[in-house]
Every structure is written in C-alpha cells, then in structure tokens.
Amino acid sequence: MEVREWLKLHRKSKKPLLNLSQAAPMSPPPSNLLKYLSEQYLLTENHLYGDVLGDIPLREEIVNLWNEEYSSSICINNVAITSGCNQAFCAAISTIASAGDSILVPVPWYFNHEMWLAIQGINIIPIPCDINMLPDIETAKKLIDKKTKAIVMVTPNNPTGVEYPSKLVKNISNLARDKNLKLIIDETYKNFGNKQSNILYEGKW
C-alpha cells in the first residue's frame, strides 16, 4: 500500500516507472463477475458446508483439464480444492514434515513459504542460485540429509519471474526420486509465461 501511495506522487515523472512491488491487484473485478457473485450470494445452498475436498463438479473439471494438459491419468480422489496456493502449500507441508525436519527451497523464495515453515518449526534449507537465478543442483545434492523431507520449486519463480528450464526441472525431479523426497511444484504463474516442456507434461509425475 505504501508503494502505491508513493507512485501516485510520481505519476508525472519524465521517465517511465518500473513497478516491481508485490503483485497485488489494483483494478476492480469485472462487472459481470461481480453480478454473478451477488446472485450466488443469495442462494441458500451456497451458505452450507460442502464437500471437504471441494465441490465435486469443480474437481471433475480440474481432473479433465490436468489429464489433458499434463498427459496424466489422475482421478477425482487426487484433487483437493484449497483457498489458493498458500493453503495448498500449508496442507502439503503438514502432511509430509514435522517440527525439526528440513525442506530444500531455492533462493530467492516466496516469503509465505518461509513464514509457514517457520511457524511449523521446519527448517528451510536454501539452495543457492547461479547468475541466471537458477538453483544449483549439485549443491542441492550435498544439502540433503536424514531430516530432509522435500524439495520445493516455484516456476515461474516468485519473486524473480525466472522460468526453470525443462532439463533443470527434470534433474530436480530425479534427485527427489532418487533420495525418496517429496517434490512440491508451485505453478501459480505458469499461464503468464511459455508452456514449459518439462516432466509435468510427460505424464510421469
């Protein structure tokens, strides 16, 4: 919010301003979406508890979408709806790690990931990156020990925006498989970049 106020004071700058602040929405939702939501708000059934894992029609649609996009063969039992990727990360971490365990995360990382791991008492082990902001796979191998439970990737990366090459994603996937680690991939921004030809699209994940 403070950055936005600062921008208002410099609207007439002679040079273009590059806004590299938090990717928070600054425009209102489309009017047709607001109209639809207001109509749904008046329906009694929308104020009752639903399926814990999410509405079945929505999960079925996601199954169809992912099976087509990723050449996979998942079913509705493999899909759970969460309140955004933050909750999905929290749920995933809670099922695979406990206080005192470790999770490998490339730097720089998404700040909410660090906060949740800290709250849970889980150690975050930084994987250093090269000059192109890509994680060093050889260093990652040396960081794994008996307390390591998973490797986390965000691609395109938040906050750098770097898309991890398919070869790198595959190498990290193989490392996780070889070391019997879970692999958590956050693709929040995947539709903002190029379609990546990586393991996710090979039907092997």
Protein language model regions, located:
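Residue-level signal for alpha-helix termini/capping positions
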Residues: 11-12, 42, 97, 144-145, ...
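Conserved PLP-anchoring active-site segment centered on the Schiff-base-forming lysine
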Residues: 95-117
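Short acidic capping loops at alpha-helix termini that bridge into adjacent secondary structure
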Residues: 73-79, 100-102, 147
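Flexible low-complexity scaffold tracts in large eukaryotic assembly proteins
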Residues: 20, 155-158
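Short beta->alpha connector loops at strand-helix junctions that form conserved
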Residues: 107, 126-130
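Glycine/Thr-rich phosphate-binding loops of Rossmann-like dinucleotide-binding domains
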Residues: 28, 89, 113-114, 160-161
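N-terminal small-domain helix-loop-helix segment of the aminotransferase-like
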Residues: 1-84, 91
